[in-house]
From Swiss-Prot:
One of its GO terms (molecular function) is magnesium ion binding. Mg(2+) 1 binds at D34, D86, E158, E160. This is Flap endonuclease 1. Interacts with PCNA. Three molecules of FEN1 bind to one PCNA trimer with each molecule binding to one PCNA monomer. PCNA stimulates the nuclease activity without altering cleavage specificity. The keyword Iron-sulfur does not apply. Binds 2 magnesium ions per subunit. They probably participate in the reaction catalyzed by the enzyme. May bind an additional third magnesium ion after substrate binding. The lineage of its organism: Eukaryota, Fungi, Dikarya, Ascomycota, Pezizomycotina. It is found in: Nucleus, Nucleolus; Nucleus, Nucleoplasm; Mitochondrion. Belongs to the XPG/RAD2 endonuclease family. FEN1 subfamily. Residues 1-104 are annotated as: N-domain.
Length: 395
């Protein structure tokens, strides 16, 4: 699910943090990709009759088709993808997963009804909602990646958190996912729409965390607190707290501790906290996720030559793909994986870490920016109140 309305807030408050460009702009870069999110997007690309792509035996092949051709497109454009699969979900996420399961059950019932009486749009809508990435989908995609020579890692828990660790360590340029909570896990750069189909004509969004924090006038802890308030996978949202209110609460109070205290002391009880709302546990999951360290041998990956005959056996013999297309794709893969060894110029220069003095100056700058925003909001309130108190018709 990610973080509700976070992209919209960044777009409005920190527009300089977002760059949009073509896939070819990522040439020569290694990217850690949230595999489960990608597979889900391949599976929901259903036809208007509500059916996924299938072979003659009636087996779903949408996930394999998407994984093969979208990965091929990335490699064609000089990108070296590293896929990261989800492990076991954190216990705190069980409530959200239960809700998703319930929604999928309801969608399945809705789909059956739509097939009887609904329009093509209804069928497509409900079909998307019933989609679930299974262990079999993951296992088949892992088998395919191995045959393609593309590395993958299975994270201990959340794939986005593992992608973020690899990006922080400089093992990859960025983490790629549609889930905005990748930024909460401290990924310096998030790429969105990287595994979308070419037909969708969606530009690649490149979001820089440092510029997000600068634009919002926040430190990372405040940013994570804002994301928890907006609504994340770990907790129920607070009723009546939307994006505008969440942003104002963080700017006024500075932390979730103070926000919770103010809500509990409010005699009017304008906002009522959910009965079980362990926000500190949620914050800990963002700051200390269960991940493999970047120097773990499992994270020491290589891009290998594809196994052409293995690809033909799996995709053509077992899954009914076109042999000509698979062989052509395998040849492109081998050729372009070699050519993507060419490094970008920026790869020769390591970023110099900030000194304590620079960090302190940056913190002061954020605090000053936050104070300016508070003063501006206060003045706007005064101006509104003054305008209301004026008699009608007064100049």
């Amino acid at each position: 699910m990610g973080i509700k309305q976070l992209f919209q807030i960044i777009k409005e408050e920190a527009p300089d943090a977002i760059k949009e460009g073509e896939i070819k702009n990522q040439f020569g870069r290694k990217v850690a990709i949230d595999a489960s999110m990608s597979i889900y997007s391949f599976l929901i690309a259903v036809r208007s009759d509500g059916q996924q792509l299938m072979n003659d035996s009636g087996e779903t092949t949408s996930h394999l088709m998407g994984m093969f051709y979208r990965t091929l497109r990335m490699v064609d454009n000089g990108i070296k993808p590293l896929y990261v699969f989800d492990g076991a979900p954190p216990k705190l996420k069980s409530g959200e997963l239960a809700k998703r399961f319930q929604r999928k059950q309801e969608a399945t019932e809705g789909l059956e009804e739509a097939k009887e009486t609904g329009t093509a749009e209804d069928i497509e809508k409900f079909s998307r909602r019933t989609v679930r990435v299974t262990r079999e989908h993951n296992a088949e995609c892992q088998r395919l990646l191995k045959l393609m020579g593309i590395p993958y890692i299975i994270a201990p828990t959340e794939a986005e958190a593992q992608c973020a660790v690899l990006a922080q360590a400089g093992k990859v340029y960025a983490a790629a996912s549609e889930d905005m909570d990748t930024l909460c896990f401290n990924s310096p750069i998030l790429l969105r729409h990287l595994t979308f189909s070419e037909q969708r004509k969606e530009p690649i969004q490149e979001i820089h965390l440092e510029k997000v924090l600068e634009g919002l006038g926040m430190e990372r802890k405040q940013f994570v607190d804002l994301c928890i308030l907006l609504g994340c996978d770990y907790l129920d949202p607070i009723p009546k707290v939307g994006p505008t209110t969440a942003l104002k609460l963080i700017r006024d109070h500075g932390s979730l501790e103070k926000i919770v205290e103010a809500m509990e002391k409010d005699p009017k009880k304008k906002y009522v906290l959910p009965e079980d709302w362990p926000y500190k546990d949620a914050r800990d999951l963002f700051f200390e996720p269960d991940v493999r360290k970047a120097d773990d041998p499992e994270c020491d990956v290589k891009w290998e030559k594809p196994d052409m005959e293995g690809l033909v056996q799996f995709l053509v013999t077992e899954k009914g793909f076109s042999e000509d297309r698979v062989r052509s794709g395998g040849a492109r893969l081998e050729k372009n994986l070699k050519s993507s060894q060419q490094a970008r110029l920026e790869g020769f220069f390591k970023p110099v870490p900030k000194t304590d003095a620079q960090k302190a100056a940056h913190k002061r700058k954020l605090e000053e920016k936050n104070e300016e925003k508070k003063k501006k909001l206060k003045q706007e309130k005064k101006d509104k109140a003054a305008a209301k108190s004026k008699p009608r018709g007064a100049a």
